[in-house]
């Protein structure tokens, strides 16, 4: 399969997605060791995040799915582990469901990029001081990934806020929040 943007005009299969944002992460150990970039994606859930995931796993809506697809990022995968243990859903791990990419390191750059992203409605302006993944790139990455699951009608997707926001209007998405939507794949 060639990498690149999915042709959004060639979609056709409707899929019910039950989006779940991962539980609250604990970055303390990684920050103490000065991890940056994708190194921060190794953060496990905090104790609160584990409680959130345990509560989430009892949500009856999740049992209506046929499969759970999770981001490979630790906080999402740990959240997914609670759900699959309780529901018995088969689990697939997808590296393309990772968090939104900012091509600069540091929390300050991430926050600046997030503000620019929101201010520019997901576009990357030519004169942007920080490079980041656009809304169109994120949406395309998600659709490319989910095309593998077209045979399923209902899929739980454990992922990240910025990725979820490309498909749902929610301004704020809490840890372990569940949001249903229909997506054309």
Regions found by a protein language model. Name each.
Residues 7-16, 59, 92, 96-115, ...:
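Acidic, low-complexity terminal tails and accessory targeting/binding regions
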Residues 16-92, 177-179:
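Active-site-proximal alpha-helix that buttresses catalytic centers in soluble enzyme cores
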Residues 17, 66, 153-161:
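Generic beta-sheet signal
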Residues 26, 76-77, 100-101, 163-165:
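Short, active-site-adjacent cap segments at secondary-structure transitions
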Residues 29-30, 34, 39-44, 85-141:
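Phosphate-handling substructures
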Residues 70-74, 96, 158-162:
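Short, well-ordered beta-to-alpha junction loops that form the rim of enzyme active sites
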Residues 138-150:
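A short, acidic, amphipathic alpha-helical segment used as a generic capping/interface helix at domain edges
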């Amino acid at each position: 399969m060639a990498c690149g943007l999915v042709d959004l005009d060639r979609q056709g299969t409707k899929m019910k997605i039950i989006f779940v944002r991962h539980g609250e992460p604990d970055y303390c150990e990684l920050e103490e060791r000065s991890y940056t970039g994708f190194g921060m994606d190794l953060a496990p859930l905090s104790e609160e995040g584990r409680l959130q995931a345990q509560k989430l796993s009892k949500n009856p809506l999740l049992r209506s799915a046929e499969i759970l697809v999770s981001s490979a990022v630790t906080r999402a995968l740990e959240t997914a582990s609670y759900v699959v243990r309780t529901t018995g859903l088969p689990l697939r791990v997808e590296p393309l469901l990772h968090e939104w990419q900012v091509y600069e390191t540091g929390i300050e750059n991430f926050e600046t990029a997030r503000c620019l992203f929101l201010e520019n409605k997901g576009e990357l302006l030519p004169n942007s001081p920080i490079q980041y993944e656009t809304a169109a790139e994120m949406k395309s990455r998600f659709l490319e990934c989910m095309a593998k699951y077209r045979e399923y009608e209902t899929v739980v997707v454990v992922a990240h806020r910025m990725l979820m926001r490309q498909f749902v209007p929610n301004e704020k998405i809490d840890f372990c929040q569940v949001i249903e939507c229909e997506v054309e794949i």
